[in-house]
Amino acid sequence: MKIAIFSDTYLPQINGVVTSTQTFSRELEKLGHKVLICGPKMKGATRLTHKVWRFRSFTFPFQKEYRFINPFSRILRRFKKLGVDIIHVQTPFSMGYLGQYLGWKYKIPVVHTYHTHWEEYLHYFPLFPKNIEVDIYP
């Protein structure tokens, strides 16, 4: 199978999502699958290769390590020709939206992995009441 992994974070960043993306990629390739990683272009990142596609991006206003991508990249014209069988989205943000959109547009199945326990971050957002109950089950 040809699998495209979409993530808002990738090397040279180091975090749990990057580690997960690398692990998925390595293990899927061991099983004989071809993997394409789609992530943001950033300082120190490798250039476009057959395995990693980089999208122009800009920093998130109050979190400099996170980036938004420009979804109007010319490389998207080549996406359909790749013959991707499944899209694995690793983020609910800009690259995740792009992966979901491409899945819808080209009728490619999409799976999504959440890496953040959102209920543990609600207290950082003043719009949510302090006594809100969140029922999230693994």
Residue ranges and their predicted role:
Residues 1-54, 79:
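N-terminal subdomain of nucleotide-sugar transferases
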Residues 125-131:
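Short glycine-enriched, charge-decorated loop/helix-capping segments at active-site entrances
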Residues 61-89, 95-101, 105:
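An amphipathic, basic-hydrophobic alpha-helix
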Residues 49, 99-102, 125:
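Short amphipathic alpha-helical segments
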Residues 3, 86, 103-121:
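Active-site proximal beta-strand in glycosyltransferases
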Residues 105, 132-138:
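Membrane-proximal helix-turn-helix segments that form the acceptor-binding/catalytic region
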Residues 60-63, 119-124:
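A short acidic, helix-capping loop that chelates divalent metal ions and anchors anionic groups
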Residues 38, 89-90, 113:
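Structural motif
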